[in-house]
Amino acid sequence: MSHDSDDKTFPYQKDDAELRRRLTPMQYEVTQHAATERAFTGEYTDTEDAGIYKCVVCSTPLFESGAKFHSGCGWPSYFKPLNGEVIDEKIDYSHGMVRVEVRCNHCGAHLGHVFEDGPRDKTGLRYCINSAALNFESRPENE
């Protein structure tokens, strides 16, 4: 699934040649062609450090470490984004399923999917995000 067929225009317009130079092949395939990294292989699956997870394409802050939880699914999971403005959601009919795709609302990079099986005492949502779509910026707990 390529985002080229999507009608939505995002504020950050990325140059494909520049992205191919700057991103790893996995980062490029995940963010630009909605690929999925293999479960339990991502850099941030088990990260517990305090900080902010940002879009690997445009550096938009997306998730705080305080919203991260261990879901056991094999990908970093969060019960909410940093705020309601940073995420774009789109129905995804690929692979014979109906899911909700999660994209960066600034550049349109594919991040992962959101499911309704997250912590019930929080939002009930599980944002299942590819590590390859993220960069982590460590921050002290008290910031």
From Swiss-Prot:
- Gene Ontology MF terms in the entry: peptide-methionine (R)-S-oxide reductase activity; zinc ion binding
Pfam short name (any one): SelR
Q: Enzyme class, one word? A: oxidoreductase
- Keyword list, A-Z: Metal-binding, Oxidoreductase, Zinc
- Catalytic residues of the enzyme: C128 (nucleophile)
Q: Which cofactor does it need?
A: Zn(2+)
The EC number(s) given in the record are: 1.8.4.12
Looking at the record, the residues that make up the MsrB domain are 16-139
Task: Give the GO terms filed under biological process for this record.
Answer: protein repair; response to oxidative stress
This entry's comment on the bound cofactor is: Binds 1 zinc ion per subunit. The zinc ion is important for the structural integrity of the protein.
Keyword Acetylation included in the entry's annotation: no
Q: Which family does it belong to?
A: Belongs to the MsrB Met sulfoxide reductase family.
| Name this protein carries in UniProt | Peptide methionine sulfoxide reductase MsrB
The organism of origin for this protein: Burkholderia cenocepacia (strain ATCC BAA-245 / DSM 16553 / LMG 16656 / NCTC 13227 / J2315 / CF5610)
Q: Show the taxonomic lineage.
A: Bacteria, Pseudomonadati, Pseudomonadota, Betaproteobacteria, Burkholderiales
Recorded name of the encoding gene: msrB
